[in-house]
């Protein structure tokens, strides 16, 4: 597979800069290897490079169970599912990647992000307790990713978001699960992580704003 071709098509995907960088890592690894022997994997890779995540997930699912022990195939499946908004399946796929490759920081990242998205989805029918469990799991996975890649600012930023969301969940006045102490602790930890991000780039106005907002949320707890 031509690396220039891969790079050109990757730039056409409608992804954020951070997620694009994560995708390049895995897809480039595939590109540098011989063409995969499984036709469904090849079709999945092509669909992914074309930005067709739904087709990519369909082809990669068909590659299982034959490729169920290949963390790269499972990663691409989870990545496709994530960008389809199928966060439950994505979290499951990334869990399988982690079981095969416990040092895969990107898998921890996407599993955490998928669970965070599930926890805060407006249409969610999950109980408050289930949402709290998802956010706690998300925080734990970001922490594991940080243990692998301690200097990745994105991991601290996203863990801060998970802490903030946990603070909102626990700190909503009148809610059955209201817990001022837990909410305060979550906001404080979010602030610490946001401030860690600023040590990498002190000029980031968005993070400065998030620090201020987290402090306001914390200080307004009743």
Positions of PLM-derived features:
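Terminal, low-structured helical/coil segments at or just beyond the last alpha-helical repeat
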Residues: 3, 10, 32-37, 173-222
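Canonical positions in the second alpha-helix
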Residues: 62-63, 96-97, 144-145, 197
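Helix-start (N-cap) detector for alpha-helical repeat units in TPR-like alpha-solenoids
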Residues: 36-38, 71-72, 105-106, 153-154, ...
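Register position in tetratricopeptide repeats
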Residues: 49-50, 83-84, 117-124, 165-168, ...
């Amino acid at each position: 597979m031509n690396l220039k071709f891969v790079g050109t098509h990757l730039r056409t995907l409608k992804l954020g800069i951070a997620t694009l960088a994560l995708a390049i890592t895995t897809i480039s690894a595939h590109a540098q290897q011989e063409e995969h022997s499984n036709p469904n994997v090849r079709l999945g890779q092509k669909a992914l490079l074309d930005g067709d995540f739904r087709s990519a997930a369909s082809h990669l699912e068909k590659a299982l169970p034959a490729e169920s022990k290949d963390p790269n195939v499972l990663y691409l499946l989870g990545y496709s599912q994530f960008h389809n908004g199928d966060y439950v399946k994505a979290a499951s796929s990334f869990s399988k990647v982690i079981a095969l490759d416990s040092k895969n920081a990107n898998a921890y990242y996407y599993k955490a992000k998928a669970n965070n998205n599930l926890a805060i989805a407006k249409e969610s029918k999950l109980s408050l307790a289930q949402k709290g469990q998802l956010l706690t799991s998300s925080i734990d996975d970001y922490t594991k990713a940080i243990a692998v890649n301690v200097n990745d600012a994105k991991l601290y930023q996203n863990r801060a978001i998970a802490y903030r969301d946990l603070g909102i969940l626990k700190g909503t006045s009148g809610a059955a699960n209201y817990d001022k102490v837990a909410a305060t602790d979550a906001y404080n930890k979010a602030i610490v992580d946001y401030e860690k991000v600023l040590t990498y780039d002190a000029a980031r106005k968005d993070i400065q704003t998030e620090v201020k907002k987290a402090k306001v949320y914390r200080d307004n707890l009743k």
